[in-house]
Amino acid sequence: MIGQNRTFVIGLDLDNTIINYGSLFYDVALENKWIPTECQKDKIGVREYLQAKGRNDLWTELQGLIYGPYLTEVVPYSGVDDFLLECRKLKIPVWIISHKTRFPAVGFQYDLHASASAWLFASGLIHDETGGVNKDRIIFCETRSEKIAAISRLQLTHFVDDLPEVFLDAGFPKETTRYLYAPEGIQFQHTYFESITSWKD
């Protein structure tokens, strides 16, 4: 993705793009006895199980727990730090633009923006340099429309996200090169974006 072109301005999603939740959704849901042990051990499996049982309320509450008090238990995907280091070396600015409400819709009202910011600073990914991510290049958006508007306003040359629907939104800027992050190796063929399976791609 990175070349010698220093006119790049790169944008990254946060959840499931930078942050690797692993089996945390499964672990916390199981701890609360919301799912059986045989449930698929990832975010999608837990979500599909709860929604199939008509318990979208538990799914929403689970997200609040994961993105709030349990966020300290997650780590970045392998290669994220190397990617951002390369951006710092090349003086390529990187923005983190996350679609994340400030408070959960149900359950305890954790400040999810504060939790995510604290995690980012604790992760060592934020540096006060021209390239890479600094404290002034982190944006939390309450809606997908706000997120896409921010991508457009900042005139990002590239954006990485784990959700195809972001790239397929009619408002997504056509000038921005789109990379779908699919670490599970699932390849999505589409003319609007390119799939990558690791940060080394």
Spans of features found by a protein language model:
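Asp-based, Mg2+/Mn2+-dependent phosphohydrolase catalytic module
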Residues: 1, 152-153, 158-159, 163-201
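Active-site neighborhood of HAD-like aspartate-dependent phosphohydrolases
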Residues: 1-58
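Short catalytic/ligand-binding loop motif for oxyanion handling, primarily in non-cytosolic enzymes
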Residues: 19-21, 103-107, 147-149, 167-169, ...
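Metal-dependent phosphoesterase signature
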Residues: 36, 43-85
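Substrate-recognition element of Asp-dependent hydrolases with the DxDx(T/V) motif
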Residues: 71, 80-120, 141
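A structural signal for isolated positions on well-ordered beta-strands in alpha/beta enzyme cores
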Residues: 93-95, 137, 158, 179
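Structural recognition of alpha->loop->beta junctions
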Residues: 116-139, 192-201
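Donor nucleotide-activated moiety binding/catalytic core segment of transferases
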Residues: 131-155
